[in-house]
Amino acid sequence: MIQSQHSQTARHALAETVVLAKARKNLSFAQLTEGTGLSEAFVTAALLGQHALPVDAARNVADKLGLDDDAVLLLQSIPLRGSIDDRVPTDPTIYRFYEMLQVYGTTLKALVHEKFGDGIISAINFRLDVKKVDDPEGGSRAVITLDGKYLPTKPF
């Protein structure tokens, strides 16, 4: 039976347990994703409390981390989503994304509407990918792909 969370408390606590177990076992999110049939971004988001995992994926990850049956059930529950409090993020990495949206949010909105019309980009029918590439000028660059289905506004 599908279960749904009414608060973020249980999933936040499980996320803390997951991060600690991951560190103790010296595992990467890529290693935890292996054998799930899902993307690294989706599994990572699920382990951090933002998605529900299918039963087989939940068991696979729980076995790798040494989590109990209650954790397997909780990993399958639909979370109350949203990881940023109702304030400006203070973590430097998350803040940079916030800053990007502050600077480019209206540009993204204008370009999406110009190319697609009135509507939104889905965060449900969505894919996320993060790649590290060499910068020709030295160092590394982050290539982040946000791939969401366009959903038009429908007059009623």
From Swiss-Prot:
EC category: lyase
A GO BP annotation: cyanate metabolic process
Keywords linked to the UniProt accession: Lyase
GO molecular function, one term: cyanate hydratase activity
Keyword hit for Hydrolase: no
Catalysed reactions, semicolon-separated: cyanate + hydrogencarbonate + 3 H(+) = NH4(+) + 2 CO2
Pfam families per UniProt: Cyanate_lyase, CYNS_N
CDD domains: Cyanase_C (cd00559)
E.C. numbers: 4.2.1.104
Active site positions: R96, E99, S122
General function of this protein: Catalyzes the reaction of cyanate with bicarbonate to produce ammonia and carbon dioxide.
Family membership noted in the UniProt record: Belongs to the cyanase family.
Name this protein carries in UniProt: Cyanate hydratase
Species annotation: Burkholderia lata (strain ATCC 17760 / DSM 23089 / LMG 22485 / NCIMB 9086 / R18194 / 383)
